[in-house]
């Protein structure tokens, strides 16, 4: 009985950390479809495979970092960098410190702005009040440490995944013919593979800065090898959800007005099925995406 309980706890931690990766990756740009369109769909039919390449690239990097952190018991990014870079730590640890400060300024700012604006649109409350609500929620979750962050990440991930599937699957099914036509058009246009791979590389590399917030979760692993399992699961989750978003955006990618859209997902919903119900749901997902990234 005790072994069974320990096994369940072990796998819940592995899954929880995988969800931390997903919620960190899933921000307002992901929810709105803007990032997926800019980095993938714009580069033609290669968008069906390049998200997987980017996430595998991330998974290898994150798995090694978490494995290293657990093996050497370094659970804050400064100690981790010092151990990783060795005699080069005085240079690279300090460079990473500057990078991390920049990221920590930008990520919450984007969360406050995106979440506050969307919440204001949904509720009609003043923007500043909505921004304050978002900020208080993020602050409360953050001050209670990594255990609460991991639990919140798991709950948010389930809500986000279910929400994305509700939004995208009906539109993908209803517009499967448009997806086929778009893929054929993309294929005939012969977009260069090199540019598509480079864009995916840029997207994946930008995500690597998240390692600073990941290493603290390595403490919860029973063994260093659990990091590999966790990031493997996270990789599969991210690939599936990114592919779903790609297919959804492909339903409207051939529309001449698509290039003007700042929120491709909203344009997809308004052009597809169930817009009355799905439009507010997309707004909620954008808020959850902004909050999950900041947390």
Where are these regions (language model features)?
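Hydrophobic, membrane-embedded alpha-helices of multi-pass small-molecule transporters
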Residues: 11-31, 50, 103-104, 171-176, ...
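Extracellular loop-to-transmembrane helix junctions
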Residues: 8-12, 39-66, 235-239, 243
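Transmembrane-helix boundary/entry motifs in multi-pass membrane transporters
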Residues: 3-13, 42-48, 71-103, 121-127, ...
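Membrane-interface loop-to-helix entry segments
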Residues: 110, 114-117, 126-134, 141-172
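Juxtamembrane transmembrane-helix boundary signature
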Residues: 21, 52-78, 248-255
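Hydrophobic, small-residue-rich membrane helices and short re-entrant helix-turn-helix hairpins
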Residues: 2-6, 33-38, 144-155, 212-237, ...
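Hydrophobic alpha-helical segments and their helix-loop junctions in multi-pass secondary transporters
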Residues: 28, 101, 138, 142, ...
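Extracellular/periplasmic helix-exit of transmembrane alpha-helices
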Residues: 62-67, 174-180, 199-202, 218, ...
